[in-house]
Regions:
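PLP-dependent amino-acid enzyme catalytic core
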Residues: 1-115
Length: 115
């Protein structure tokens, strides 16, 4: 289960506006919600096969985090020029990273081959 994040209510021009603090998620972004939702829907054979995703940032971290929590192997196809902080954060969750050159290679083809 994802950690709960606070809901802040602020009145703007007389209208209550709600703000969800997704920056307080474990990866610091809302992308973790979609990854968690999708991975929890996998059946056991799919979980055993593992997941492949492509991203250079928050989606990669979301998939990697959810996969680790659920015990699912994860491979992330990430451009070689992705920010080091994003690569390190993704690796820290236990995911494998497959690098590619975004100018000469297709992430979709690489991911399809790995799947």
């Amino acid at each position: 289960m994802l950690p709960q994040t606070p809901l802040f209510v602020q009145e703007i021009r007389g209208v209550p506006v709600c703000f969800k603090a997704e920056c307080l998620q474990p990866i610091g972004a809302f992308k973790i919600r979609g990854a968690w939702h999708r991975l929890t829907a996998l059946d056991d054979p799919a979980r055993e096969r593992g997941v492949v995703a492509f991203s250079s940032g928050n989606h990669a971290q979301g998939v990697a985090w959810a996969a680790r929590k659920l015990g699912i192997p994860a491979v992330i196809v990430m451009p070689a020029d992705a920010p080091k902080v994003k690569r390190d954060a993704t690796l820290a969750t236990g995911a494998e990273i497959v690098s590619y050159d975004r100018m000469t290679e297709s992430r979709e083809k690489i991911a399809a081959h790995l799947a």
